[in-house]
Amino acid sequence: MAAATPTETPAPEGSGLGMDARLDQETAQWLRWDQNPLTSESVKQLIAGGNKEELRKCFGARMEFGTAGLRAPMGAGISRMNDLTIIQTTQGFCRYLEKQFSDLKQRGVVISFDARAHPASGGSSRRFARLAATAFITQGVPVYLFSDITPTPFVPYTVSHLKLCAGIMITASHNPKQDNGYKVYWDNGAQIISPHDRGISQAIEENLEPWPQAWEESLVDSSPLLHNPSASIGNDYFEDLKKYCFHRTVNKESKVKFVHTSVHGVGHEFVQLAFKAFDLAPPEAVPQQKDPDPEFPTVKYPNPEEGKGVLTLSFALADKIKAKIVLANDPDADRLAVAEKQDSGEWRVFSGNELGALLGWWLFTSWKEKNQDQSNLKDTYMLSSTVSSKILRAIALKEGFHFEETLTGFKWMGNRAQQLGDQGKTVLFAFEEAIGYMCCPFVLDKDGVSAAVICAELASFLATKNLSLSQQLNAIYVEYGYHITTASYFICHDQGTIQNLFGNLRNYDGKNNYPKMCGKFEISAIRDLTTGYDDSQPDKKAVLPTSKSSQMITFTFANGGVATMRTSGTEPKIKYYAELCAPPGNSDPEHLKKELDELVGAIEEHFFQPQKYNLQPKAE
């Protein structure tokens, strides 16, 4: 999305860059509007030094506001997260909300933030949240601004709980330390979906000039429109969470030891409180990682999904105190990774799909014990995204509840869960393979705090039966059928290459012909959610919503395998997800793993063609 063309202004004196006129205009306008001395000074220096390349990076194109909001590095310019772009974004969002809600000035919005900061540009999540609050308050809109850092799920919880019009969370979740983001929730408590992203985007373009009091963030401290929900929401959230504690007596007596890491993010205090709410002894926190630190000094990437590299300190502490289970939240505590020490002495990090199987089984089992009336099953649902394991489908088929698949991302599951709730249905659980879990539908998004404590209760309960998480997972696969999954990605920074790669798959054996084989593996069905084609449907049209702006093709194979190739919405990656599903009974998991490895090898060789497209494999 190109930046709105500003009014004609002469280039800053002495720029002498001979830059294209638009860049001159953008930088001149920036210097008129930006009141942050660090970012405005850095732009002046780039102009004085004639650093055209860096100026193009900063001013080439405005950050695109999508359904995930914004995510970009912090720094100067319209392509970065900084004071001015936060002001502009919030002004647009405010105007859009005014059009959508006649009672915006009665209901208001909630804003919270994580612990990120970027001293070089003076940007931080806290400051961005205060500037966003200022924009709404100057327009007479009540703002519920948390006084300190919170997990991301507290924002959708507050929207639903206080019946607000919208929520904003300033976070870049598990991205590298230089990034920040702006995540938006609608009045139903779920992340926005189209067409709201386009409407907000347009409103941002129409409201680029800072309003008269935009920079006066001290306004928020004295405004009667400002409310601090920290104490009441914290209290209410943990009261609601207690309803999902099924074995309080077991918890009180549990001898299972847990290690928890918040990976320098916001999770520590909240997970401690969650354990207290469940009457579990508090988990042992990794001391080097428990306090928020925007530098993330002990990890290369603050992403627990990366596995053992992020968990090294957790394993060391667990070995020291003889704990068998590690719980790891990402920095904004909306996701959860779990590892368990095996009898061999090795640590097993569960994949998102494996933990989805365990939590899904547990929440259904616990619900069934409380609801003896089996007629309720027809109104009971679980959800997962289309690239996640189909294990919940297998459990649903055998147990008699409903399973639904959505597009990738919790925005789809949150909105679907809300629709089902409105129809009087019960949504027990939703998950995605990227270690995101919705265990309690009072938050219509992934929540790593509730997932951590529910996982701890599950482990404590299993311990009374002398079972480990790994043993229970195996029992689930024996009962409902083995579901062996794998996922990886290739890095590709060039959009043209990505278009060519997917274009080749759509014209594999001549124009408009998808592949019929992948190496030795026969393809039985193809669904392309970029074009809306699905040859398993009678009319060849896909049932799930399609999006021309992202690439996504799913191949079903004659051997029961399913593989999806898709582009990432937030990173320069082409991802793939593959699964082999076997019917219930004692299948041979080793044989299935071998067959899945062969299938993935064929997909990499024939469909990705990394040499031809110069793709960079995932670093092991």
Curated annotation (Swiss-Prot):
A Pfam short name: PGM_PMM_I
Cofactor: binding comment: Binds 1 Mg(2+) ion per subunit.
GO biological process: glucose metabolic process; glycogen biosynthetic process; glycogen catabolic process
Reaction it catalyzes: alpha-D-ribose 1-phosphate = D-ribose 5-phosphate; 2-deoxy-alpha-D-ribose 1-phosphate = 2-deoxy-D-ribose 5-phosphate; alpha-D-glucose 1-phosphate = alpha-D-glucose 6-phosphate; O-phospho-L-seryl-[protein] + alpha-D-glucose 1-phosphate = alpha-D-glucose 1,6-bisphosphate + L-seryl-[protein]
Parts forming coiled coils: none
Matching InterPro entries: A-D-PHexomutase_a/b/a-I, A-D-PHexomutase_a/b/a-I/II/III, A-D-PHexomutase_a/b/a-II, A-D-PHexomutase_a/b/a-III, A-D-PHexomutase_C_sf, A-D-PHexomutase_CS
Keywords: Carbohydrate metabolism, Cytoplasm, Glucose metabolism, Isomerase, Magnesium, Metal-binding, Phosphoprotein
CDD domains according to UniProt: PGM2
Organs and tissues of expression: Highly expressed in lung, spleen and thymus. Expressed at lower levels in liver, brain, kidney, skeletal muscle, testis and heart.
Cofactor: Mg(2+)
Annotated residues for binding of Mg(2+): 173, 330, 332, 334
EC number per UniProt: 5.4.2.7, 5.4.2.2
GO cellular-component term (any): cytosol
Record-annotated active site: 173 (phosphoserine intermediate)
Domain of life: Eukaryota
Assembly: Monomer.
Function: Catalyzes the conversion of the nucleoside breakdown products ribose-1-phosphate and deoxyribose-1-phosphate to the corresponding 5-phosphopentoses. Catalyzes the reversible isomerization of alpha-D-glucose 1-phosphate to alpha-D-glucose 6-phosphate but with a lower catalytic efficiency. The mechanism proceeds via the intermediate compound alpha-D-glucose 1,6-bisphosphate. In vitro, also has a low glucose 1,6-bisphosphate synthase activity which is most probably not physiologically relevant.
Family label: Belongs to the phosphohexose mutase family.
Protein's name according to its UniProt entry: Phosphopentomutase
Source organism per UniProt: Mus musculus (Mouse)
Gene name tied to this protein: Pgm2
